[in-house]
Swiss-Prot record:
Protein name per the record: Solute carrier family 35 member F2
Gene Ontology CC, one term: membrane
Subcellular location: Membrane
Pfam families the UniProt entry points to: SLC35F
Lineage: Eukaryota, Metazoa, Chordata, Craniata, Vertebrata
Length: 391
């Protein structure tokens, strides 16, 4: 008996339906993938934070140079009081597990340390202006970038790609270009008056402040992703106002008595507090949308916005290097946001900010733990990233 033969139909490119043949993407399509709406939105949100920092620096400059009101602790204290009035009182009137007392019962000491870190980060950088040059502060402030990247890698389990590192390096090169422009245009006039030991102290203060900023940023990212923005700001307002008030009473009460109060100074304090409150309120939103690393890269443009305003307000000299610096930082941001980071979800990692009195999950004692890697997306791509299993 002859076995029945099966007919096999071979599909070639000629007999496939036209809609099943996808042409290779052209340059315009690739540009749209890179400059997606989500990527442009992420860059724009970071620039809003930079503009708020610009407002903070301009009002501080007017207060210190024109009115001789050197009160950085008092200015921060006003912001913490406003955070307390808005967000801490919101927590106080809530019911259940999100109530202020319930949060304090579970996590009070963690937020206490976060509040102290937030206060001292600002204080160290402001104090460094008395010991070292402005250009040194510009350059050493970039130390916050590797701090945030390392902390995000080890504690938030964020994994980066090559383009992320290229973007970060480009942003730091932009800051270096801006510092070079400051030297060429003579904006640094006090640098020769700082003795070596004094300058070393100032540089150490900047590095310490940048490190504390990095720790604070990573803690904020964890809290807004796992808890809530209102809880974060309410706790910072509570502990920040308490500890900054104590530090103000000890270290700055004499300076506060020397302030020549009038309506102009009052208006500058109001403007500073409004910008600072807006920065603190909006930053958790941007962190949740992007990441702690992304916002610290985005805020590198704040110094350039301050310079551009200074062209009209303080008659700074212009140089094309400032524009080159600005576009170099923006190019670095485009590189950084053009691809997605991903988060390794390891079951061996214990969530430290969770309620320690909650139920304990038993991990299997036998067998090899296989942490998975989950990709997070900042774009509207529909293509799914592969799931990776780590042996």
């Amino acid at each position: 008996m002859i076995p029945e033969q099966t007919n096999h139909v071979v599909s070639t490119i000629e007999n496939l339906p036209a809609e099943s043949i996808s042409a290779s993407p052209g340059p315009l399509h690739r540009m749209r993938n890179v400059f997606s709406r989500e990527m442009l939105l992420s860059v724009a949100l970071g620039q809003v934070l930079s503009l708020l920092i610009c407002g903070i620096r301009l009002t501080s400059k007017y207060l210190s140079e024109d009115f001789h009101a050197n009160t950085p602790l008092f200015q921060s204290f006003l912001n913490y009081i406003l955070l307390f009035l808005v967000y801490t009182t919101t927590l106080a009137v809530r019911q259940g597990e999100e109530n202020l007392l319930a949060i304090l019962k579970r996590r009070w000491w963690k937020y206490m340390f976060l509040g102290i870190i937030d206060i001292e980060a600002t204080y160290l950088v402001v104090k460094a202006h008395q010991y070292t040059t402005f250009i040194s502060i510009q350059l050493l402030n970039c130390f916050v970038i590797p701090v945030v990247i390392l902390l995000s890698w080890f504690f938030l389990l964020v994994r980066y790609k090559v383009l992320h590192f290229i973007g970060a390096i480009a942003c730091i090169l932009g800051i270096g270009c801006m510092a070079g422009a400051d030297v060429l245009m003579g904006r640094q006039q006090k640098g020769d008056f700082y003795p070596g030991d004094s300058k070393l102290i100032g540089d150490v203060l900047v590095l310490g402040g940048a490190t504390l900023y990095g720790i604070s940023s990573v803690c904020q990212e964890y809290i807004v992703r796992n808890l809530s923005r209102v809880e974060l700001l309410g706790m910072i307002g509570l502990f920040g106002s308490f500890f900054s008030g104590i530090q103000l009473a000890i270290m700055e009460h004499k300076e506060l008595l020397k302030v020549p109060w009038d309506w102009q100074i009052g208006l500058l304090y109001v403007g500073f507090t409004a910008c600072m409150f807006g920065l603190y309120s909006f930053m958790p939103v941007v962190i949740k949308k992007t990441s702690a690393t992304a916002i610290n890269l985005s805020m590198l443009t704040a110094e350039l916005y301050t310079f551009f305003c200074g062209l009209f307000l303080f008659h700074y000299k212009f140089s094309g290097l400032y524009l080159l610096s600005f576009f170099t930082i923006l190019l670095g941001l485009v590189f950084y946001f053009s691809t997605n980071t991903y988060v390794a979800q390891d079951p061996r990692v214990y969530k430290q900010f969770r309620n320690p009195s909650g139920p304990v999950v038993e991990l299997p004692s036998s067998g090899q733990l296989e942490p998975s890697v989950t990709y997070t997306s900042l774009s509207q791509e529909t293509e799914e990233e592969p799931r990776v299993r780590v042996a």
